[in-house]
Amino acid sequence: MSARQHTPDLRADGFTFKRFFIAHDRCAMKVGTDGILLGAWAPLRHESRILDVGCGSALISLMLAQRCEGRVPVDAVELDIAASVQAAENVAASPWRDTVVVHQADIVEFSCTTPHRYSLVVSNPPYFAAGVACASPQRTQARYTSSLSHEALLHSVSAVLMPEGRFCVVLPSQIVGDFLFLAESLQWHLALRVDVADNPRRPVHRVLLALTQAPIDPVYSSALLIRDELQQYSPDYRALTQDFYLSM
């Protein structure tokens, strides 16, 4: 059966998209807007190979595989054993089982051993400094930078990114300034930025960034509303995600 003919069954133990299903009951971080935003937005050019750092359930990896029509290899790296097993199962049940490969590995070690170089790297990374413990060690690992500092992440991506490649992340708005300051100190350059708000009455709460290792001029900035004044999905959000949500 081809990717275009594949229609996922509706199930209650995960999230059903138009062309694949994501089970996430063994993953610390469930399917959410952050991952969907990054997977739908990350700019695609003439990609040769893609890396998803901290892939969790493989949501972003499969979204990118769909957008590339299975023509671009995707390596999905996940440290947590249970999540990596479930990610591999999600990939195996998808139309892109021959395109996406899940690696249970630490990205710092992976970046030192992989023979591949990537034209696009994406990550929905841990974002908070160590604080109140979460309900499980797995969720603490997924949310807090004690498991992977932003500096270590930036160094690891730098080691595997092609000179003309891009590194795309989604981050909470309150830490973007510190992240960009750190990135610039490590010779990264901002290429694209999208400030995301839930609706016109709410402040920006998430930011999508594309970074490069070569200066980009000009830097493009824009804004995205998820919902409009009537709490309906905005036209821009619909256009971004309509290939994935069943309801669009």
From Swiss-Prot:
Gene3D superfamilies linked: Vaccinia Virus protein VP39 (3.40.50.150)
Uppermost EC category: transferase
CDD domains listed in its UniProt record: AdoMet_MTases
One Pfam family named in its UniProt record: MTS
Intrachain S-S bonds: none
Keyword vocabulary terms for this entry: Cytoplasm, Methyltransferase, S-adenosyl-L-methionine, Transferase, tRNA processing
GO biological process: methylation; tRNA processing
Compartments, record wording: Cytoplasm
Enzyme Commission no: 2.1.1.223
Primary localization: cytoplasm
InterPro entries recorded: DNA_methylase_N6_adenine_CS, SAM-dependent_MTases_sf, Small_mtfrase_dom, tRNA_Adenine-N(6)_MTase, tRNA_adenine-N6_MeTrfase
Catalytic activity: adenosine(37) in tRNA1(Val) + S-adenosyl-L-methionine = N(6)-methyladenosine(37) in tRNA1(Val) + S-adenosyl-L-homocysteine + H(+)
Keyword Methyltransferase: yes
Gene Ontology cellular component list: cytoplasm
UniProt keyword Transferase, yes or no: yes
Molecular function terms from GO: nucleic acid binding; tRNA (adenine-N6)-methyltransferase activity
NCBIfam families reported for this sequence: tRm6a37MtseTrmN
Cited function: Specifically methylates the adenine in position 37 of tRNA(1)(Val) (anticodon cmo5UAC).
Protein name: tRNA1(Val) (adenine(37)-N6)-methyltransferase
Organism whose genome encodes this protein: Musicola paradisiaca (strain Ech703)
